[in-house]
Amino acid sequence: MTATPPAPPRRCFVDEAGDATLFGARGRVLVGEPGCSRFFMLGALEVRDPVALATDLTALRLQLLADPYFKDVPSMQPARRKTAIAFHAKDDLPEVRREVFRVLLQHDVQFHAVVRDKQRVLDYVRARNALDERYRYQPNELYDTLVARLFKNRLHLGPELEVCFASRGKADRSAALRQALQTARARFEAKWQRHVEARIEARQAAAAHEPALQAADYFLWALQRHYELGESRFVQLIWPKVGVVQAVDETAVAPYGAYYTKKKPLVAVTSGLG
């Protein structure tokens, strides 16, 4: 009798949009000021075949770099270290973004995200400071809590999970990120009284070296455009690839926030690239 081969590990690629900063010099509140994002969001893109995705994205980038149409575009010049090195939705031309989205929608991927309203986070920080004047908010605190939220209900879905986080600055935060994943495991087990046996690995990588992180960036960019600018056509485009978007601070209906899924879309979903 032939043994059943083990299930392949689930592979997730995690990036952020916006920033977790609340304060500037001398404690000045930055939320609401120009240049400071109103929302901070963390997203995980689960990719069935990261090698195939990397192959297609790399081939697309080389094809675009060889296209005379983009010859003199600043972001396509290697010295600028932008699109010539890696796709990054914020820096890429609209024509480039269209082609990247076209490739992403052809792959077996699923996107999950958690969104925080930084004004509500600021309210929490102020309330906590009123109770404990020694408390000092750190941006990594918000990031790590969102990691735990993002993976709380996803760690039990397979025997092995590999999570690649986009590098943030020069510090190696692999240990802190592993701890955040363990927090997610503990919260799931406490809530459901069920042990999670999955083996979990966490690592960091630069997006330039991991095309799947570039893909995650594109999904987050689409979500960010909706929340920050009210521009929803990109999130409509990617919605067939979305699992769940949790808007923690949308508490008008339920205290735990709002969950958007295929059955309950964030906005009316349309199909096609338009």
Model-predicted segments: where are they?
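Phosphate-ester processing/binding pockets and catalytic centers
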Residues: 1-274
